[in-house]
Amino acid sequence: MGLNDTLVAPRSRGIIDPNTGNPVGANDPFYGAINEELSDKGFLVTSSEALITWARTGSLMWMTFGLACCAVEMMHTSMPRYDAERFGIAPRASPRQSDVMIVAGTLTNKMAPALRKVYDQMPEPRYVISMGSCANGGGYYHYSYSVVRGCDRIVPVDIYVPGCPPTAEALLYGILLLQKKIRRTGTIER
């Protein structure tokens, strides 16, 4: 390396496909259209509804309503191995700051009014994920006199995550399904 060589690194080309020598996704029509629009105008044109839906799916704030052993798996989801925040979701302590409530565990008759009260404190649009057999339908304690046979009898549920207890991967998949549902249905009421 002499004094005449530049000290600037060459521009990154991304991941190179060994078969073609081109960057991966270079011939993808979706990204091609976006690149063409950005290079032509310098900005993208979209509807406000698509922008709001994109922002909602990428910044879901969830609050835990952990009632039993499923709450431990919910904590695993936030830990470094699974790192739920890379999908744009982060835990919040207050229902007034959250979009999603994850109900995990056995819901009893005494706890049902508290669940409804917390749900009512959440701002619209609000979503509920029912996590585990106990939250879905009473689970192992289904026939007990004090157990609500599914949290969907108290609050409307958007996504059901099965299992006893469900794994952290199952909860992540449920969260991704919720993001897909939000993208599909939108959030603006007309």
Swiss-Prot record:
Enzyme Commission code: 7.1.1.-
One Gene Ontology biological process: aerobic respiration
Gene Ontology, cellular component aspect: plasma membrane; respiratory chain complex I
One of the record's GO molecular function terms: 4 iron, 4 sulfur cluster binding
First-level EC class: translocase
Cofactor note: Binds 1 [4Fe-4S] cluster.
Keyword NAD set for record: yes
Entry keyword annotation includes Cell inner membrane: yes
Cofactor requirement: [4Fe-4S] cluster
Family according to the record: Belongs to the complex I 20 kDa subunit family.
NCBIfam families: nuoB_fam, PRK06411.1
Name of the protein: NADH-quinone oxidoreductase subunit B
Species: Chelativorans sp. (strain BNC1)
Name of the gene: nuoB
